[in-house]
C-alpha cells in the first residue's frame, strides 16, 4: 500500500507536507510518494531523520495555484504536483492521494483523472465537524454538488455510511437528513423525496435534523446537498472560531481572569483540540475509483499526518470495493424505476 501526497499543494507547502509525511512514516510505517519540485523537497526532507526507504519523490515542474480555474488547470498543467499524484492513483501506483491544494481542481481531477465508480452519479465530499454528543459528525455532501436529485442523496447516505464504518470505526453509524424541521414530511421536494428513499436503505436512519442541532445532535452523519452542506460546515467553523476568540478575550481582560485561565488551562486545551480542524484530517471525496482526500488549505503538519492516516484506513478498509458493491446492487434493484 502506498499513499501519495501533493507536495506543493496548500498554503504552507511544501514544509507542512514534508513534516507531515515524515511524522506519518515514523508513526504508521507507511510507504509514501510525494510529488513536487525535487530539489525543494529534498532540501526540506534533509532537516529530518527518518527511514528514507519509505519515501519516493516524483519530480514535477508545475503547481496548480488557488486562483487557477479548476478544470482548465487540470487539463493544462499535466506536470503539476496534483495531476501527477492523481495519475499515480489512477494507474494503481498509489492507493490514495492527500492534497491541501486548490479544492475545485482536486474535485475536477478526482472526477476526470481518477474517475467515478461505475454506477455512481455524483461523488460526495464529506467533512467532519465537532459534535458535543458524538465526538464528530460527517456532513455529506459539503460542497461538491450544489444541485442534487434524490438519487444523489441516497448515494451520499450509503457512501458516507460505508466510510464511517470502515475508516472511522463506527459499528452502526446514525444517519440523519438536514431539514427545516424534525417531522417527517417537512422540507422542500428534494428533501421529502430523499427521506422516503433513504428510509428504504439498510441504514440506521434516524430521520431529520435541524441546523441548530448540527454540533449537538445524536447523529454521526448528516445528509444534504452540497450547497446546504457547505453553509452548515462554514457556519460551524465560524461559530467555533468566534467562541475561541471570545474565550481568549474574556480570560485576557483582567489579572483575575488570567489567573482563572491558568487554573483551567488543561480544560481550555481540550476545548481547543475539540474544535481544531487538524484533529479531523481531511475530507474524502467518495464515489471515485481510488482514495481522494482533501486536506484543509492551511493544514499544518499534524493535519497532513492525520489525513495520511485517513488514506491508510481508507485503503485497508476497502472503501472503494464496498461502494462498488452497494451501487451495483442498488442500481440492479432499481433499474426499472424512473430516473429521479
UniProtKB/Swiss-Prot annotation:
- Where in the cell does this protein reside? Cytoplasm
Which N-terminal residues, if any, form the signal peptide?
A: none
E.C. no: 2.3.1.274
**Its domain of life?**
Bacteria
**Can you supply a Gene Ontology BP term from the record?**
fatty acid biosynthetic process
Q: What molecular function does GO assign, one term?
A: phosphate:acyl-[acyl carrier protein] acyltransferase activity
According to UniProt, this protein's pathway is: Lipid metabolism; phospholipid metabolism
Q: Which InterPro entries match?
A: FA_synthesis (IPR003664), Phospholipid_synth_PlsX-like (IPR012281)
For this protein, the record's Pfam families field holds: FA_synthesis
Give the protein family: Belongs to the PlsX family.
Q: How does it assemble?
A: Homodimer. Probably interacts with PlsY.
Which NCBIfam families does this chain map to?
Answer: plsX
Main function: Catalyzes the reversible formation of acyl-phosphate (acyl-PO(4)) from acyl-[acyl-carrier-protein] (acyl-ACP). This enzyme utilizes acyl-ACP as fatty acyl donor, but not acyl-CoA.
Protein name stated in the entry: Phosphate acyltransferase
